[in-house]
From Swiss-Prot:
This is tRNA(Ile)-lysidine synthase. GO terms for molecular function: ATP binding; tRNA(Ile)-lysidine synthase activity. GO terms for cellular component: cytoplasm. It catalyses: cytidine(34) in tRNA(Ile2) + L-lysine + ATP = lysidine(34) in tRNA(Ile2) + AMP + diphosphate + H(+). The lineage of its organism: Bacteria, Bacillati, Actinomycetota, Actinomycetes, Kitasatosporales. It comes from the Bacteria. ATP binds at S58, G59, G60, A61, D62, S63.
Amino acid sequence: MGPHPAVAAIRLAVRRVLHDILTELNTPAGVPAATAVERTPERAPGLPTAPLVLVACSGGADSMALASALAFEAPRLGVRAGGVTVDHGLQSGSDLRAEEVVLRLRELGLDPVEATAVTVGRAGGPEAAARDARYAALDAAAARHGAAAVLLGHTRDDQAETVLLGLARGSGIRSLSGMAAVSGAGGRYRRPFLQVDRQTARKACMVQSLPVWDDPHNADPAYTRSRLRHEGLPALEKALGKGVVEALARTAQLSRDDADALDTWARQAEAGVRDATGGLECAKLYALPPAVRRRILRRAALEAGAPGGALFARHIEEVDRLITGWRGQGAINLPGKVVARRQGGRLVIRQG
């Protein structure tokens, strides 16, 4: 008799991601994966030959299910499995809970396992600040242990929430594409559960008798995502019927495909709108489709030093009006002390 369907689903999702990681490790640079010859990745003397994959685990149902699936699948594929839990220090006793998570991960057979404490700032609000601190800690842990990848437990439900949050902000198609299955420097972060619903992950924990911790912040109406999860999505499903989460997740993937195509188009078009000095020619920018032109403008602002997290669509729209609605207006101030101005038919974006 095979495993429970929920357990089978989470294991299959992790197995596929581990196969992807191994394929990439065994593929020489510049050689298509389909034609690569199996080989052992070159590693520094003294390091274990088996690649290490870490799981980021809060102790909640999603990440505990992910940890259990990694613990099961990794040794079958010759992969070492480890875990990291991040103590944000935002709740009383969070250090003790982090220690409990470490014990649970070790009981699953993961090694190495560690808890790392972070200080959460205030930039961008509590949710964004906690996320930034968490990823910084995970980056450091991955570098410290030489991990090939870090698995994150985001589910299809999380993806649906992310799409709705982007929609509410009036964001572009990139925000509507939600979370990528592969992200971070060198594809460090992997999200195996983006096609797995939250209920399946919780069921997998239950049938495996895995203890889980329900973060009270996830039910706190002070947090936007919590309100969306407990009020917004249920209201949508009541009004529109079941299948809203699946539809939003599908929208994310379709949007990502479109956004990737537009990004590629913009990169290819950028060379054609720059003059001999590297400046942007307004007439050539004007001739491009708006979606392509604005991507070029955003890239130019980022290259000039504007922080991506503070550079919003309204900023790019203001810069775009220097091209499409030119009336002799003055310079546009962007985040990061970056200034955009039109000079003699050229658009100049640089530090003020």
